[in-house]
A protein has these predicted regions:
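Canonical tetratricopeptide repeat
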Residues: 267, 301, 334-338
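C-terminal "post-core" interaction segments
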Residues: 1-263, 267, 325
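Helix-start (N-cap) detector for alpha-helical repeat units in TPR-like alpha-solenoids
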Residues: 262, 296-297, 330
Length: 348
């Protein structure tokens, strides 16, 4: 069978003589409009919102990026606009040196660069030079990120070069340039949305756009944009009951599904323990076991904090709990080794 590629635009079927789309063609959602253009904007008067779809970091053949965004921001300044939605969910990258007029335009817009006024829709095709763009918007603007995680590491290798394998002579392309927009402790497999909104196949088929709907219906009272920072602030104020209540609420809320609370709490516990703040560390580790009782790692970490606090009996109990949850894995092995050390210390 001869190989072929189906006709497509940005991963979606392009209907033609031999291919048809499952999507209802009567109407077209904003993110699929004018796909012959790299970017376009539209005013949505009901919500006083300017919507921009930008799907490559390249100049469109009819209008360069600086000219396009100059027009967008002039429209915002001169009209009754309350929100800007920048949709880059289809944007696979390009030339990240072309990001500057987008970022500076947002920074300079007093009307838009405010919490709850500027939204960036991201998704599984947001990649490469567009990862640089969303990183910069995260660093320097009040963007609220909506949708699904990007498909690129926050810091990443890019800009490939052709090399030839020495034995097979096969050509391959390897990325060589390290792009680091954020410090290493903020690196992650992706940029996660602050407001998680998933899109189903049925949504696509029926022309629904839950991500855009979430932007248009956003209320800043409904969302904590920095969940970990929020919990840390409560913790530092000594409001431990509120820390626990808020942590339970947010870990059960699908809007925060891409926040790795377990890992963040675990790291916070170790930071406190390494600073000799043992009671605070114990509180954080105990909270993590309440939130994630089936995680062997949370019990292993709590056991270590108990051991270092002189609470050996509790350490033994919690290490055994970790082994029970992970009898054949690395965490279980770590707990068994810790128990051997505890036993040898008691014997000595």
């Amino acid at each position: 069978v001869d190989a072929f590629r189906f006709p497509r635009q940005y991963g979606f079927v392009k209907p033609g003589d031999e291919w048809m789309s499952v999507r209802n063609q009567v109407t077209t959602p904003n993110y699929l409009k004018h796909l012959d253009k790299i970017y376009y904007y539209e005013y949505l008067p009901e919500s006083k919102t300017v919507y921009v779809r930008h799907s490559q970091i390249q100049d469109d053949k009819d209008e360069a990026i600086p000219a396009f965004y100059k027009k967008v921001f002039e429209f915002i300044d001169k009209n009754d606009v309350e929100k800007l939605v920048l949709d880059v969910r289809l944007n696979g990258g390009g030339n990240n040196y072309k990001n500057k007029p987008i970022v500076t335009g947002i920074i300079e817009s007093k009307k838009i660069n405010k919490p709850g006024k500027f939204f960036v829709i991201i998704g599984r095709r947001t990649f490469s030079a567009c990862q640089n763009l969303v990183n910069e918007l995260s660093n320097y603007t009040n963007a609220v990120f909506v949708g699904e995680p990007t498909s690129e590491n926050i810091n990443f290798y890019g800009d490939n070069r052709r090399i030839e394998l020495p034995k097979t002579r096969l050509p391959v392309f390897l990325s060589f340039a390290w792009w680091q927009d954020k410090p290493q402790w903020e690196n992650a497999p992706w940029l996660a949305p602050q407001l998680a909104v998933e899109m189903s196949f049925d949504d696509y088929k029926t022309n629904k756009d839950p991500a855009l709907d979430a932007c248009l219906n956003f209320s800043d009272q409904d969302l904590v944009l920095d969940p970990i920072g929020h919990l840390k602030e409560l913790f530092m104020a000594g409001k431990l009951d509120q820390v626990e209540a808020e942590a339970k609420r947010m870990t059960g809320d699908p809007k925060y599904q891409y926040v790795n609370f377990e890992q963040k709490f675990n790291q916070a516990g170790y930071d406190l323990m390494n600073s000799k703040q043992m009671e605070s560390a114990l509180f954080v580790f105990q909270l993590n076991t309440k939130l994630y009782p089936k995680s062997a790692n949370t019990w292993d970490s709590l056991a270590e904090a108990c051991w270092k606090s002189g609470k050996t009996d509790k350490a033994v109990e919690y290490y055994n709990k970790a082994i029970e949850l992970d009898p054949h894995g690395a965490t279980g092995d770590n707990s068994r080794n810790a128990l051997k050390q505890i036993k040898s210390q008691k014997t000595f």
